[in-house]
UniProtKB/Swiss-Prot annotation:
Species lineage: Eukaryota, Metazoa, Chordata, Craniata, Vertebrata
Biased composition (Low complexity): 114-134, 307-319
Post-translational modification: Phosphorylated on serine residues.
Domain PDZ residue range list: 14-94, 154-234
Underlying gene: NHERF1
Protein name (database record): Na(+)/H(+) exchange regulatory cofactor NHE-RF1
Residue numbers bearing the N-acetylserine modification: S2
Biased segments, Basic and acidic residues type: 135-149, 348-358
Leader sequence segment: none
Disordered: annotated segments: 114-192, 269-358
GO MF terms, alphabetically ordered: chloride channel regulator activity; protein-membrane adaptor activity; signaling receptor binding
Phosphoserine modified-residue sites: S2, S46, S162, S269, S280, S290, S291, S294, S299, S302
Keywords: Acetylation, Cell membrane, Cell projection, Cytoplasm, Membrane, Phosphoprotein, Repeat, Wnt signaling pathway
Record organism: Macaca fascicularis (Crab-eating macaque)
Length: 358
């Protein structure tokens, strides 16, 4: 085929994995009637997931060696022989189908061939951005292929004899409903649905914050046909950084922009100021509260202030402060003061009633 056709073809993915404490974190299997080995399951948080490996990917090369015609055990032996790191060239079902139609052989050199002519593109893309051509988001997407991929996907499928052909599940560590697996040759696979996709909308209705049963009911309510707006892991992270919920407007329209470091710092500074504002008044509030209290006490005492200043008689009535009276008189007044503070005597005629109530 021509070089131009190859240049426009979708590309495989090169996933570089470093073995963790529990291995690489993916399951390999072969399918009946299909040649090759496939990724069946990718464990969350594993080196395989971090490297971008997806369930349903077909394994083409291991450390630069083609394994398309090798048996399951031969491929496993190659991976184990790599010790603590391995390089896997894979293709997802959609890319695999398109490359087969174009007659392109999947190999690692295909990625290098695409990188070489594109080295001058970043500078041209920077100039285009500097020119401020904001009215052509699709052109900006073309100069940023990684951003062009970070779009939601609308998967339209009609129910087959065995249903749609996918399993739905929820993850305790992550909010939302996810595609656990997609059956080969199913309506779900034909629509482009992939394992680990997160469902955003069902038949145009947003499923954010919905429970598992709600999503299942919405799918069943569509009858024999359903439309699922989904995002893969990378796209989901991109929209979360932008603080935007994906929608059908993002299928072809302009994409949101993630917060830059400056904006994040501004947000952090605003949060810090807000925290400082919420925390700093606390001591001042204590002081103002005490001053308010003292003012209230003074205002209450201000009318009696005249009493407290005028009646030196009240101060002279204090047995301790009055030095003009005799000691016996002072003792008598002190005794009267103590007796006036005593609790009233109990009516013992009611003691039985009181105790019985207790």
């Amino acid at each position: 085929m021509s070089a131009d056709a190859a240049a426009g073809a979708p590309l495989p993915r090169l996933c570089c994995l470093e073995k963790g404490p529990n291995g690489y974190g993916f399951h390999l299997h072969g399918e009946k009637g299909k040649l090759g080995q496939y990724i069946r399951l990718v464990e969350p948080g594993s080196p395989a997931e971090k490297a971008g490996l997806l369930a349903g990917d077909r394994l083409v090369e291991v450390n630069g060696e083609n394994v398309e015609k090798e048996t399951h055990q031969q491929v496993v032996s190659r991976i184990r022989a790599a010790l603590n790191a391995v390089r896997l060239l894979v293709v997802d079902p959609e890319t695999d189908e398109q490359l087969q139609k174009l007659g392109v052989q999947v190999r690692e050199e295909l990625l290098r061939a695409q990188e070489t002519p594109g080295q001058a593109e970043p500078a041209a893309a920077a100039e285009a951005q500097g020119a401020g051509n904001e009215n052509e988001p699709r052109e900006a997407d073309k100069s940023h292929p990684e951003q062009r991929k970070l779009r939601p996907r609308l998967c339209t499928m009609k129910k087959g004899p065995s249903g749609y052909g996918f399993n739905l599940h929820s993850d305790k560590s992550k909010p939302g409903q996810f595609i656990r697996s997609v059956d080969p040759d199913s309506p779900a696979e034909a629509s482009g649905l992939r394992a680990q996709d997160r469902i955003v909308e069902v038949n145009g209705v947003c499923m954010e914050g919905k429970q598992h049963g709600d999503v299942v009911s919405a799918i069943r309510a569509g009858g024999d046909e359903t439309k699922l707006l989904v995002v893969d892991r990378e796209t989901d992270e991109f929209f979360k950084k932008c603080k935007v919920t994906p929608s059908q407007e993002h299928l072809n329209g302009p994409l949101p922009e993630p917060f830059t470091n400056g904006e994040i710092q501004k947000e952090n500074s605003r949060e810090a100021l807000a925290e400082a504002a919420s925390e700093s008044p606390r001591p001042t509030l204590v002081r103002s509260a005490s001053s308010d209290t003292s003012e209230e006490l003074n205002s209450q005492d201000s009318p009696p202030k005249q009493d407290s200043t005028a009646p030196s008689s009240t101060s002279s009535s204090d047995p301790i402060l009055d030095f003009n009276i005799s000691l016996a008189m002072a003792k008598e007044r002190a005794h009267q003061k103590r007796s006036s503070k005593r609790a009233p005597q109990m009516d013992w005629s009611k003691k039985n009633e009181l105790f019985s109530n207790l």
